[in-house]
Amino acid sequence: MKIHVAGFFAGLFGALATLFILLSFGTDYWLLASETCNSHLNSPVTSERGDILVNQVHDPNSEAPNITFHHEGFFWRCTFDDVMNDGNLWKFWFENQPHVRVCKPAYLLPFPFPDQSYNTTSYQTAIIYRGFWSVSMLVGVAAVVAGGFIIICAAPFASHRLYKAGGGLYLISGFFVLVVTAMYVIWIDVLDVISLYTEYQKLNKCADFELNKTYGLSFMFAPVGVFFCFLSGLLFLVIGRTVHHQYN
C-alpha cells in the first residue's frame, strides 16, 4: 500500500516537473527589459533580413514617451516599441500586447548584445556562454522527457531497473536546469555585461539612456521544475529499491 501511495506522489511530482520545465523551455519570457531614451522617443524598431515582424495598429496620438521593450527565452529574443504610463513593467506585460515586434533567434545570442559592432571580444564570449547555457537546457529537457517515458514503461511491469533509471533521469534533469538557472542569474546580475551595455548605449545612443530589467515567468518556472524533479527523482529511486527488495 505504501509503495502505491509513493508511486502516486512520485508520478504527480514527475508530471509537474515535466510541465514546468517544458513551459520554461518553450516560452520566451526568461527576461523582461525596457530601454528608455528621451532623445530618441520616436525611433522605429529596426529589422534585418530574416527577422520576423508582427504588425498591429499603433496609436500615433499617445503622448507618453516611447519605450523599447525586450523579452527573451531559449528560442527567440524579441523587441518592440510601445508606451508605458505607470512605470510598472509587470503590469504592462500582463495588460498590453506589443504593437510591433522584431524577433531574432536567441540560441547563441543573449540579451544585451545587439550585434557584432558592440564589442567583438564580448560578442564571442557571449556566444560561448550562451552555447553552454543552451546545451544545458537541452540536456535538462531531454532528460525529463526521457525519464517520464521510462517511468510510464516501468509502472505496468514493476521493474526496479526502470524505476531507478527514470528517477536518475529526473535527478539529472533537475541538476542541469538548476545549472541553467544559475548561469542566467550570473549573466544578468553577477557579470558586468548589463552595466557595460548601459555605458555603451549612453555614449553612443543618448546620455539619459535607462535600462530596467526583471525576470519573467519562464525564469520562475525553472526552479519550480527543479524542485519537483529532485523530489520525484528521489521518490522513484526509493520505489525502485523497494521493488527490488520485494522481488529478490
Swiss-Prot record:
Glycosylation sites: 66, 119, 212
Membrane topology value: Multi-pass membrane protein
Glycoprotein listed as a keyword: yes
One example of a Gene Ontology biological process annotation: muscle organ development
Extracellular side of membrane: 27-136, 189-218
Gene Ontology CC annotations of this record: plasma membrane
Subcellular localization, as worded in the UniProt entry: Cell membrane
InterPro entries linked to this entry: PMP22/EMP/MP20/Claudin, TMEM182
Keyword terms of this UniProt record: Cell membrane, Glycoprotein, Membrane, Myogenesis, Signal, Transmembrane, Transmembrane helix
Keyword Transmembrane helix listed: yes
Signal peptide range in chain numbering: 1-26
Membrane topology, Cytoplasmic segments: 158-167, 240-248
Domain of life the protein comes from: Eukaryota
Transmembrane segments: 137-157, 168-188, 219-239
Function: May negatively regulate myogenesis and skeletal muscle regeneration.
Protein name, UniProt field: Transmembrane protein 182
Organism field: Danio rerio (Zebrafish)
